[in-house]
Amino acid sequence: MANKREFSLEKTRNIGIMAHIDAGKTTTTERILYYTGKIHKIGETHEGDSQMDWMEEEKERGITITSAATTAQWKDHRINIIDTPGHVDFTIEVERSLRVLDGAVTVLDAQSGVEPQTENVWRQAENYGVPRIVFVNKMDKIGANFDFSVKSLHERLNANAIAVQMPIGAEDQFEGVIDLFDMVADVYDEDKLGAKWETIPVPDEYKEEAESRREEMIEEIAEVDDDIMEKFLGGEEISNEELKAALRRATLDLKAFPVFAGSAFKNKGVQMMLDGVVDYLPSPLDVKPYIAHDKEGNEVELLADDNKPFAALAFKIATDPFVGRLTFIRVYTGSLKSGSYVLNASKNQRERVGRLLQMHANSRTEIPEVFSGDIAGAIGLKDTTTGDSLTDPAHPLILESLDIPAPVIQVSVEPKSKADRDKMDVALQKLTEEDPTFRAETNPETGETLISGMGELHLDIMVERMKREFNVEATIGEPQVAYRETFTVPTQAQGKFVRQSGGKGQYGDVWIEFTPNEGKGYEFEDAIVGGVVPREYIPSVDAGLQEAMKNGVLAGYPLIDVKAKLYDGSYHEVDSSEAAFKVAASLALKNAASKAGAVILEPIMKVQVIAPEEYLGDVMGSITARRGQMEGMEDRAGAKVINAMVPLSEMFGYATTLRSSTQGRGTFTMVMDHYSPCPKSIQAEIIKKRGGNA
């Protein structure tokens, strides 16, 4: 079976390209595809013509939204690349890609170093144990500073970044890079789009600095590898092969992160970074075996082996204009031919894979079979959704699913006509299938459709997609914040439901202790002794509470972070039922509300604003006026970086305010940080607006 493989597992790399928005990630991916022979014309993101940014919305905005998977070849290796979005509204795409990658390239902007979204994606990569190399991009930009960028990796991410190159010049003097292993300089020919470069001895004016940086690099590698340290201290000669092998081991163990320099836009340094992908990032054989669970819940290690039973994870659903519903899969073990049946173990359903495709940003090649370690697109899977496990029908396994964050912002959408209503229903069903952080629901009282997501941009793009892909004309309401409610004071309450109406009555009686459970969500404890509430009714009490908590106690927002301990109650031999105990539990919650110090929680965003110093006063004033708490300030490349915590409700329309107050020179990013109680006056306003119970 294995002989049909085009590339061995050792020569396969599954990598992601991750970065802050505008660090040049898509351009970097473009160049990789250009040099590996996958595209013949280079597309520029800022001209709206990039091969990877294949959805119309991305072309218009010049940002990457969907992680398009694409395949390239470099030095007899196959590199599968997942392009991930750098905008925080699309964090689920990043999480989703990290689940299926073996390694990643983090792209930094040489002028800015580590930025807020870099921190986010770096943390997520740490979470999934993904080895990384770093590409310091935009070395040709004014203010580019390689050493500052390396330092920011150490200081802001606590990452052991080891520079394996030294740039030759910077800004408009950036000519190429010096390889600190081979001690040669790669100098680029300006006219040949960077496809041509010359390897020359290190120029005299750089020799001394390059020698000292090489020494520093060897010392840093020695610190993460005992064998090298021994030779280093003993003054022995250490070969480049030994150094590279040690750095590879340290990178795979997340003890080191090799750093490269270049300018993707000017086509410099990308090829050496590709060598780094091959030299330092893992093949599917180098990563820890993926852990799945069998039907009994036992752990099963999935080794990358074509001869084992098939197991794969569906990590993305896309609606492709040419082939319809496309499921991106990562194969962990075994192989699969097109036309075969698989078991969707998450839903316990058999599905047939019609065709298998190898994806290039928005074109595709049909392939007869996929093998372990491959990433491919499958057509024909009708019921499979993001995070589902696809396995050999004779060996069902569940691969752990994705951790999906709850949406923080909501808007109402009103179709313009009856025909639009029908189209909108279809559109929302497709879009929610594709993106688990996008939700659509109908308010049972008002009948209006509400969509919720990770931020204003996220919802804007979904509405645009409804219009463009499904021809839905709709009116969009004002954005609403996804508030939550919680209890702040421990309390006990009874919920008793008795109904007598001829024949069989209803009887349920519970005493529940409610305590605040900050940051831990809802927990239920059964503390019943002596059977005062029979075993079979206890799950109904839990279910009744969870159901009641969905609509809160103050203004109809979900109640979170509460521990409920069922400790007493009573039942009736004939009249008690699961339904009665469900109602009793919801009554206990209602009765507790007035004594439990119920409050409304609002989402607090971690906001970072970058603006020239002359606008500092305006920016800080504007943040304070929005109930923002300053968290600190730093200097960065001639600008001030302001960190603050600001309630989401105050951030609507901030982009416009910032643009006008800084004459378009200020930028900001925000990411959800935590929930915090609203000030009393704002809470009263929210309750009044929602017609709740103050």
From Swiss-Prot:
Residues given in the record as GTP binding sites: 19-26, 83-87, 137-140
Source organism superkingdom = Bacteria
Q: Which is one Pfam family of this protein?
A: EFG_III
Which InterPro entries does this chain map to? Answer: EFG_II (IPR041095), EFG_III (IPR009022), EFG_III/V (IPR035647), EFG_IV (IPR047872), EFG_V (IPR035649), EFG_V-like (IPR000640), EFTu-like_2 (IPR004161), G_TR_CS (IPR031157)
The entry lists its GO molecular-function terms as: GTP binding; GTPase activity; translation elongation factor activity
An example Gene Ontology CC term for this record? cytoplasm
The subcellular localization recorded is: Cytoplasm
Ribonucleoprotein: present as a keyword of the record? Answer: no
This protein's major location comes to cytoplasm
Provide a GO biological process annotation: ribosome disassembly
Annotated SMART domains: EFG_C, EFG_IV
Q: Where does the tr-type G domain lie?
A: 10-285
PROSITE patterns documented for this protein? G_TR_1, G_TR_2
Alphabetically sorted, this entry's keywords are: Cytoplasm, Elongation factor, GTP-binding, Nucleotide-binding, Protein biosynthesis
- Similarity comment: family membership: Belongs to the TRAFAC class translation factor GTPase superfamily. Classic translation factor GTPase family. EF-G/EF-2 subfamily.
**Matches recorded under PANTHER family:** RIBOSOME-RELEASING FACTOR 2, MITOCHONDRIAL (PTHR43261:SF1), TRANSLATION ELONGATION FACTOR G-RELATED (PTHR43261)
Chain's role = Catalyzes the GTP-dependent ribosomal translocation step during translation elongation. During this step, the ribosome changes from the pre-translocational (PRE) to the post-translocational (POST) state as the newly formed A-site-bound peptidyl-tRNA and P-site-bound deacylated tRNA move to the P and E sites, respectively. Catalyzes the coordinated movement of the two tRNA molecules, the mRNA and conformational changes in the ribosome.
Tell me what this protein is called: Elongation factor G
Q: Which organism is it from?
A: Lactobacillus delbrueckii subsp. bulgaricus (strain ATCC 11842 / DSM 20081 / BCRC 10696 / JCM 1002 / NBRC 13953 / NCIMB 11778 / NCTC 12712 / WDCM 00102 / Lb 14)
Q: Which gene encodes it?
A: fusA
